[in-house]
């Protein structure tokens, strides 16, 4: 396993641990999700380039599209929650009332 794969795997696990540990604020959860998507994008791109999969060359672009949709939806939810409740604490929100 090369050094780049190890770094991206470590970045993914760090983002996953950050998502599990700092889930009290919605903004920190969104940042950790973006870090996970970025490391997945780099790992998929490097794997496709190393294995010379010509048919799977659209996979990183599709992953970026889903990451952009996730970021837009997350930011719109953050704006909605912060304007309604005045805070972005996830633990204080009751999803049945939203």
From Swiss-Prot:
The keyword Plastid does not apply. InterPro entries: NADH_UbQ_OxRdtase_chain4L/K, NUOK/Mnh_C1-like. Keywords: Electron transport, Membrane, Mitochondrion, Mitochondrion inner membrane, NAD, Respiratory chain, Translocase, Transmembrane, Transmembrane helix, Transport, Ubiquinone. Pfam families: Oxidored_q2. Its EC number is 7.1.1.2. It is a multi-pass membrane protein. GO terms for cellular component: mitochondrial inner membrane; respiratory chain complex I. Its main location: mitochondrion. It is found in: Mitochondrion inner membrane. GO terms for molecular function: NADH dehydrogenase (ubiquinone) activity. One of its GO terms (biological process) is ATP synthesis coupled electron transport. The chain crosses the membrane at residues 1-21, 29-49, 61-81. Belongs to the complex I subunit 4L family. Core subunit of respiratory chain NADH dehydrogenase (Complex I) which is composed of 45 different subunits. Core subunit of the mitochondrial membrane respiratory chain NADH dehydrogenase (Complex I) which catalyzes electron transfer from NADH through the respiratory chain, using ubiquinone as an electron acceptor. Part of the enzyme membrane arm which is embedded in the lipid bilayer and involved in proton translocation. This is NADH-ubiquinone oxidoreductase chain 4L.
């Amino acid at each position: 396993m090369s050094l780049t794969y190890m770094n991206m795997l470590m970045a993914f696990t760090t983002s996953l641990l950050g998502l599990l540990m700092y889930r009290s604020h919605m903004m920190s959860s969104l940042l950790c999700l973006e870090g996970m998507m970025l490391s997945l994008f780099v790992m998929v791109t490097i794997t496709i380039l190393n294995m010379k999969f010509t048919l799977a060359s659209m996979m990183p672009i599709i992953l970026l599209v889903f990451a952009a949709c996730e970021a837009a939806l997350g930011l719109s939810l953050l704006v909605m929650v912060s304007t309604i409740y005045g805070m972005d604490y996830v633990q204080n929100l009751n999803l049945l009332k939203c």
